[in-house]
Regions:
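Short, polar/charged alpha-helical segment
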Residues: 1-8, 126
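Structural motif
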Residues: 7-29, 139-155
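Beta-alpha junction/loop-to-helix N-cap segments that form part of ligand/metal-binding clefts
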Residues: 12-70, 165-180, 184-189
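Conserved acidic residues
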Residues: 33-35, 104, 158-159, 198
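Short coil/turn segments
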Residues: 60-62, 85-88, 111-116, 141, ...
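Short beta-strand elements at the ligand-binding edges of bilobed clamshell
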Residues: 66-97, 195-206
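An alpha-beta-alpha
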Residues: 81-129
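Pocket-lining segment of extracytoplasmic ligand-binding domains
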Residues: 115-184
Length: 206
């Protein structure tokens, strides 16, 4: 069995970006043979730490955005490869319109520190606006202002959309505690967020 020949070292940064860097730098110092980076912050930390140790990304939404690669064609190159969990954004936008045909205002809620979320927001916003829906974007810097930003978004919109977003995923309880009493439904970009505070999603099956 592979486990008899390979030593696996698992470290959890708990969605803290500085901790990602600390963990990855430790891996580099230890001379590991491969780094598996789960989610965008971990991938970014790994790429910043080494250009020689092979890196595999997983649950990374959009590599071109995450690694600031212009004209990204699907191949990162160098020591980096991996898989993407990018959802069908056009179909998510269509689902919002199908579920809420009378909605006039849709708010998009995400963490401003996550470039993948910005990308998803831009795509979904453009798709919704094609149908004449007014779309407003609401961003929080970190978990500390999630509740306040969610409250503002709920006050001003008929429906909310939250893309695949690591910070939002860790704050679904806080988001739900605001949105549910306000009676504002949330369509989520991925399954975890949907389970925590959403009513529907169309996403990657993890």
């Amino acid at each position: 069995a592979l486990g008899d020949k390979v030593q696996f070292v698992e470290q959890n940064a708990a969605n803290d970006i500085p901790t990602c860097a600390t963990i990855v730098n430790g891996f580099v110092s230890d001379g590991v043979d491969l780094i598996l980076a789960n989610a965008t912050p971990a991938l970014q930390a790994a790429v910043a730490a080494t250009d020689s140790i092979p890196i595999l990304g997983t649950a990374v939404t959009e590599y071109g955005v995450a690694l600031d690669i212009k004209d990204f064609n699907g191949t990162v190159g160098g020591n980096v490869s991996g898989t993407s969990d990018l959802a069908p954004l056009d179909q998510q936008a269509a689902m919002i319109l199908e579920l809420f045909p009378d909605a006039k205002k849709v708010g998009i809620l995400y963490c401003s520190a996550e470039p993948n979320s910005v990308y998803q927001s831009d795509v979904v916003k453009a798709e919704l606006e094609k149908s004449g829906v007014t779309v407003s974007v609401y961003t929080f810097a970190d978990s500390n202002d999630v509740a306040a930003v969610t409250a503002t978004a709920c006050d001003e919109n008929d429906v909310l959309y939250i893309p695949t977003d690591n910070t939002a995923a860790s704050c679904t309880e806080a988001i739900n505690n605001v949105a549910e009493p306000a009676g504002v439904p949330i369509v989520a970009g991925e399954e975890g967020i949907c389970k925590g505070c959403g009513i529907a999603t169309l996403s990657t099956d993890y």
